[in-house]
Each structure stands twice: as structure tokens, then as C-alpha cells.
Amino acid sequence: MQIIEFGEQRFSARADRTLWHPDSRTLLLSDLHLGKGAHFRQSGIPVPDGGETDDLNRLSNAITETNATSVWILGDLFHHPPSITDAQMDRWTNQLSGLKVQFHVILGNHDRNAHPFATTLGFHIHPEPTLWRGIELAHHPDHGFEARIAGHVHPQIEFK
């Protein structure tokens, strides 16, 4: 685990691809791309099944290990919302519903038309950018704030 001091905030970069903010008991991550494998398979691209389950299990484990109370997804919660099936939504709802955290999302470029899916899964949707504890949270890294944490480039922290 790598400790990062960013402005007046202190984070831990975790091996599970999350950024942990212990003072607020918040996990930040980006680019889950739920449904990516199924979308590729629907398009005739042979990719193995189960990737999203692994990603959600990794997130669940991170929540349990840190005792997080809040999770922020910094964009691309979904890969291609028009191809999301009822079966996928049922599976994701079952995986996420047992986690006792507040879920927040800033919708990314892959999340067009994702609003109803995100709210069904219990996510609070926030605009891009959103100011959180003096740090701009965004999906795209091109906003002009001094301190920002962004996804999109899987992921990045930019120091100015």
C-alpha cells in the first residue's frame, strides 16, 4: 500500500485498484466497465465470462477490509448501457445490495444513458466535476482545478 498526501488529505493506493481515504472511510475507483465482457461477446468477440464478477468481488473485499462507508466510482461504471440485460442487473443488484455503503458515481464517457441503471443499483449520481474535501473528483482529467482525482486514463492523480 502506497501512502499519498494530496493537499490536506491522505490516501492509500491499494493493490485492489482502489484509493482509500481513511479519515472519511471512503474508497475511490474508476472504470469498472460493468457489462464489458457480455457486450464484447454480443459483438462476436470471444472474451471469458466472469470478469465483472471478479471486479465486484474485489470491490466487496476492499469494502470489507477497510470498513468503508462510502464508495465513489469516478466514471465508466458501465461499458455500454444499451446492451445491459435484466439478468445482469439482477446479478449486480444481488452483489451490491449486501454492501452497507453509500455508492456515488460521476458518469463517464461509457455511461451515456446509464442514469436509470445506476439509480436502480442504488448509486447517487453527481455532476462532473464534483468538489469533495477540497479535491475535484471527475472522470475526465481535463478540468482546471488545482487538485483533482480522475478516472478515464485508468486511473490517474495529477499534481500541480
Give short role names for the model-derived ranges:
Residues 15, 107, 139:
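Short loop/edge segments at beta-strand edges and connector loops
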